[in-house]
Regions:
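Hydrophobic/aromatic-rich core segments of domains that either
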Residues: 1-66
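N-terminal accessory/pre-domain segments preceding catalytic cores
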Residues: 66-187
């Protein structure tokens, strides 16, 4: 994945580097860093492949243009024995931030989820994803969605005016490393 992404970046004039190291299970791993508007970002197409908990048609952006703080020494460990890659500390091109899917507090996160469920139901999109600023907020919104059943309220409200009626049949999927929550909707 990482070599292919590097090739695609090269073909399109996007400055990039292949980063090697290990993952959180000490297995060899490679990912890219790419330069967007003068800033470097981590990009891991391997870990954004929808394998496992997600349907094959789902496009994740968990590891798309993320900072070192989000992944280094958590899930990605750089082998910097021979070189030190540029720091990746910018956030402005991050997918969720760039598309208004980022929240810095619980109320904003819940409001985003509610509006994204409505948008998804109108367009028959089966997926909602947002990013939050802390693990506490991630846990708080998950509790609100599941324990307090807010997710069902949001779906019911969306279905009142949506072009397509949706339902939720699985619990939201959390990625505590990059602070994202994913909701799958069925039609």
């Amino acid at each position: 994945y990482a070599k292919t992404m590097g090739f695609l970046c090269d073909q399109n004039g996007i400055e990039n580097m292949l980063i090697t190291g290990t993952n959180d299970k000490q297995a060899s791993h490679a990912w890219n860093i790419i330069k967007v508007d003068g800033d470097w970002y981590n990009l891991d197409t391997t870990w954004d492949d929808p394998v496992g908990k997600f349907p094959a048609d789902y496009i994740k952006y968990n590891y798309f243009l993320v900072t070192d703080k989000e992944i280094h020494n958590k899930t990605h460990f750089v082998d910097n024995q021979f070189y030190a890659p540029p720091k990746c500390d910018a956030t402005k091109a991050n997918y969720q931030r760039n598309y208004g899917l980022y929240a810095e507090d619980k109320d904003k996160a819940l409001s985003l989820i509610k509006s994204e469920i409505k948008k998804a139901a109108d367009s028959k999109n089966g997926y909602v994803q947002i990013k939050v600023s802390s693990e506490k907020i991630l846990n708080d919104i998950n509790n609100e969605l599941i324990k307090n059943k807010a997710i069902y309220t949001y779906v019911d409200e969306a279905n009142k005016t949506a072009k397509h009626k949706c339902k939720v049949t699985t619990a939201p999927v959390l990625d505590k490393n990059v602070l994202t929550i994913h909701i799958t909707l069925n039609y």
